[in-house]
Amino acid sequence: MKKFKWCLWLTGALFILMTAPSLNACSLVGETIPQNRTKEQYEFEKTFEPMFNFLEQEQKDFNGLEAYNSRVYIKNGDEVKRYEIDLGITKADGKGDYRIQIGENKKTVPVSYSNGKLHYDSEIDPLFDEEILNLVIKRDVFDSLNVKRTLRTGTTELSEIIYQPENNSDLFQKLKSKYDLPEETTCQIRIDYSDKTNYGITIQLTSKEMSVKIGLTIIKKRG
């Protein structure tokens, strides 16, 4: 009987030793850390889930939001263009302003937003790109990117992830085509989180002669 118990104990010990390496490969039960993330990066990225969830939505859900901002900056040689939508949110709809700046010329018109569409109080040209306003980015786009740098500051409550530049994703190809950017263009994505309510993404497309920066910010209601 003692010999049987000793063999049973030895079998259990060997099992633990054999399974230990596989257990170390997981940060949490049922969760495997991707090969292109450290454990710290993987856990840190989870704090940006509200932004990832919003970006995945085909039909944007503004419930629980206080404000939404969408902007595009285009620099082509010496020419600079800025387009920005700034919305305050009431229930699922938004009201705010559309601002254009082309060179030194500026114009602002009131706008409202409902059911994925912008409505302008007066004529303006060009209209804001609603594909950018309702930009959809699936989570696997972020999962495929390598992390270049992370930042977390206690003084300003700012958290940030900067991903390595890339030029292969479907998102990049789509935006490169939209803005007629040259082949040598690269794309870099940054996401940020601050003040416990503000989430943002910046997509920077850069070539020798041209630069396009797309930014989205959501501000969640407190409480």
What are these regions, as identified by a protein language model?
Residues 99-107, 123-127, 162-170, 204-210:
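Secondary-structure transition/turn motif
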Residues 80-129:
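An acidic-aromatic
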Residues 1-24:
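Sec-dependent bacterial lipoprotein signal peptides
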Residues 19-71:
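N-terminal leader/targeting segments and the immediate start of mature chains
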Residues 112-157, 163:
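Flexible, processing/modification-adjacent segments and terminal tails
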Residues 170-223:
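Gly/Pro-enriched, hydrophobic low-complexity segments
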Residues 144-190:
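Acidic, glycine-rich flexible loop segments
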Residues 60-66, 86-97, 156, 191-200, ...:
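Short, solvent-exposed coil/turn segments at beta-strand boundaries
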